[in-house]
């Protein structure tokens, strides 16, 4: 038996295989059930013990050489296939890069951050509170009586469960509950804004079931309505970055302030010139609310205001439909990037 010839033939056959399928077929000629080396191993049983031992060792060495040649060719074909695939996917580094588009803040979040920045610059703290609120903090503490229409299911989202004192839970209808929460944890003078999400059963071009609001509160011994007018007028001029803004305070009613006022603004120039635009509710904090804060209404007084962040954003950017802020249309949002 010429084992050297078998090994040489196998190496030559493997080297000539152009692909894995051909290589596996060539492998069967030498290592398959009827392969040359397999037949030699089957024939060892006919030999005497001494010869069988010697020939068996020679055949095993030849088999190892054939398997080594087979594995080497397999690796070479795999490497060639990989190189071919990489070449097909090659990147021309001389081409101009496409780049990834940079993200940007949502326009309402831009307003949120801008409002915080402006009020921080004039000494206000920024606070946050729970969106799932108790009936007491959302209504009772703010001087809303038990039979107030806002407590109805048609205006307020109530949730299952009650608080530790057995009071109903709801999605807060405004950020005003933070007035009482913050004042109970801090002593006057209190200057704070509380931006956050609020919820009401309402949906049209100017209202959304979920909207963002910023509450402002200033409590001290000698805070007047004149301070409210000065602070809010200065805020509007900084927010809109223009001085041609007229502000008026219309008498109104809110259970948590007395006197109460709606704040309107008007631009002297531009496409909205001459139009009064409702911007916020405000007023002097009601003595009952101050008492619920744990403070003496005979000593402390202050003002509060509540402004819709979507409303401010609509006026700043000239958006006509509030619902556009919630549709996640990139064509709309990219305008503010």
Swiss-Prot record:
Subcellular location: Cytoplasm
Cofactors, names only: Mg(2+)
Cofactor, free-text remark: Binds 2 magnesium ions per tetramer.
Pfam families: Phe_tRNA-synt_N (PF02912), tRNA-synt_2d (PF01409)
Residues of the signal peptide: none
Subunit structure: Tetramer of two alpha and two beta subunits.
Similarity comment text for this entry: Belongs to the class-II aminoacyl-tRNA synthetase family. Phe-tRNA synthetase alpha subunit type 1 subfamily.
Protein name in the entry: Phenylalanine--tRNA ligase alpha subunit
